Curated annotation (Swiss-Prot):
The gene is pheS. It catalyses: tRNA(Phe) + L-phenylalanine + ATP = L-phenylalanyl-tRNA(Phe) + AMP + diphosphate + H(+). Tetramer of two alpha and two beta subunits. Signal peptide: none annotated. It comes from the Bacteria. This is Phenylalanine--tRNA ligase alpha subunit. GO terms for cellular component: cytoplasm. InterPro entries: aa-tRNA-synth_II (IPR006195), aa-tRNA-synth_II/BPL/LPL (IPR045864), Phe-tRNA-synth_IIc_asu (IPR004529), Phe-tRNA_ligase_II_N (IPR004188), Phe_tRNA_ligase_alpha1_bac (IPR022911), Phenylalanyl-tRNA_Synthase (IPR002319), tRNA-bd_arm (IPR010978). Pfam families: Phe_tRNA-synt_N, tRNA-synt_2d. The keyword Protein biosynthesis applies. One of its GO terms (molecular function) is tRNA binding. The lineage of its organism: Bacteria, Pseudomonadati, Pseudomonadota, Gammaproteobacteria, Enterobacterales.
Length: 327
C-alpha cells in the first residue's frame, strides 16, 4: 500500500513508452493481470484491521482505474497512428486517370467472314441466309447428291428423323435462292454447318461460306479469275494458286483450289466448279440458256491459314489468352 503511487507512476511511464498495441498489452498484463503488481496489492488487505479494509480497497481500485484509463488512451493513440499510416500508404491520387475498361474485339472467325463479305460485296454479291435445320431435299436431292452418297450416312450427318437434319453445307441456301428468283443471281451464303467429326482439323460445328453466280455466258474462266482475285486479296500476297480436277455431285466440271504455303507445300483452301445442269433443272432454270459457277470454303480453315493457327478447336474454347492475339 505504501508504494501504490510509485506503481501507478511506473505503469503510466511504461504505457507512454509502449510503441505498439502488443507492447501495450504486455504492460497491461504486468500491472493489471492476474499476477500483476496492482492486482497483488489486493492481497495486502488481509493484513489490515477489518474496519480499514474498505477504504484501502477503494484506494487500490482507484489506482487500477487510473492505469486502465491510461491504457485505453494510449491504445486509442496507437490505433489512430496505425490507421493514419495505412491511409497515408494507400493514398489515392485523384488526379490520375481511371483504369480503362478493356475493349473487346471480333472473334477471328468473324473477322474472316466480314473480310470475305466485304470483298465479294464490292463485286456485286449479296448475302443470303437459310435455315440450319434443313430437309434432305434442299441439303441433298436438289444438289444432285444420290441416295447412296456417303455424305448422307449417320457417321457424317446429324439426322433428326428420316428427312430432317442439321445442314451439312450452306448449299441449301443456293437452292432456295434459285427457286425464289430468276437469274442473274450473285450471292454468298455464310453460316454454321454441322458434321459428325471432331479432331485437330474438324469440329462438329463450323462456319462455311458458299458463293453462286448464275447468268448467261458464265464460264470457268470467270470462276478462276474471281477466285484468283479473292485469294490474293484475302492473304494479301501474290500467291501461287492451282486448280486441281475434282468431283462434286453439284458441279461439273469441279475443282479444288490450292495455294502454295510458306513451307513450299500446296495447301487446299476451297472447292468449286460450274453449276451442274441437273441442279439448274431442279430449280426451274434452263441450263441451255443459263450457266453458273459455285464455290465453298470453310471459314475456320481460311482463318487458320491466315493467322497460322494449328488447332481448329482453339476457335471454340473461349480462351482469352488466345483470342486477345487477334484484337
Amino acid at each position: 500500500m505504501s508504494h501504490l503511487a510509485e506503481l501507478v507512476a511506473s505503469a503510466k511511464a511504461a504505457i507512454s513508452q509502449a510503441s505498439d498495441v502488443a507492447a501495450l498489452d504486455n504492460v497491461r498484463v504486468e500491472y493489471l493481470g492476474k499476477k500483476g503488481h496492482l492486482t497483488l496489492q489486493m492481497t495486502t488487505l488481509r493484513e489490515l484491521p477489518p474496519e480499514e479494509r474498505p477504504a484501502a480497497g477503494a484506494v487500490i481500485n482507484e489506482a487500477k482505474e487510473q492505469v486502465q484509463q491510461a491504457l485505453n488512451a494510449r491504445k486509442a493513440e496507437l490505433e489512430s497512428a496505425a490507421l493514419n499510416a495505412r491511409l497515408a500508404a494507400e493514398t489515392i491520387d485523384v488526379s490520375l486517370p481511371g483504369r480503362r475498361i478493356e475493349n473487346g474485339g471480333l472473334h477471328p472467325v468473324t473477322r474472316t467472314i466480314d473480310r470475305i463479305e466485304s470483298f465479294f460485296g464490292e463485286l456485286g454479291f449479296t448475302v443470303a441466309t437459310g435455315p440450319e435445320i434443313e430437309d434432305d431435299y434442299h441439303n441433298f436431292d436438289a444438289l444432285n447428291i444420290p441416295g447412296h452418297h456417303p455424305a448422307r450416312a449417320d457417321h457424317d450427318t446429324f439426322w433428326f428423323d428420316a428427312t430432317r437434319l442439321l445442314r451439312t453445307q450452306t448449299s441449301g441456301v443456293q437452292i432456295r435462292t434459285m427457286k425464289a428468283q430468276q437469274p442473274p443471281i450473285r450471292i454468298i451464303a455464310p453460316g454454321r454447318v454441322y458434321r459428325n467429326d471432331y479432331d485437330q482439323t474438324h469440329t462438329p460445328m463450323f462456319h462455311q461460306m458458299e458463293g453462286l453466280i448464275v447468268d448467261t455466258n458464265i464460264s470457268f474462266t470467270n470462276l478462276k479469275g474471281t477466285l484468283h482475285d479473292f485469294l490474293r486479296n484475302f492473304f494479301e500476297e501474290d500467291l501461287q494458286i492451282r486448280f486441281r480436277p475434282s468431283y462434286f455431285p453439284f458441279t461439273e466440271p469441279s475443282a479444288e483450289v490450292d495455294v502454295m504455303g510458306k513451307n513450299g507445300k500446296w495447301l487446299e483452301v476451297l472447292g468449286c466448279g460450274m453449276v451442274h445442269p441437273n441442279v439448274l433443272r431442279n430449280v426451274g432454270i434452263d441450263p441451255e440458256v443459263y450457266s453458273g459457277f459455285a464455290f465453298g470454303m470453310g471459314m475456320e480453315r481460311l482463318t487458320m491459314l491466315r493467322y497460322g493457327v494449328t488447332d481448329l478447336r482453339s476457335f471454340f474454347e473461349n480462351d482469352l489468352r488466345f483470342l486477345k492475339q487477334f484484337k
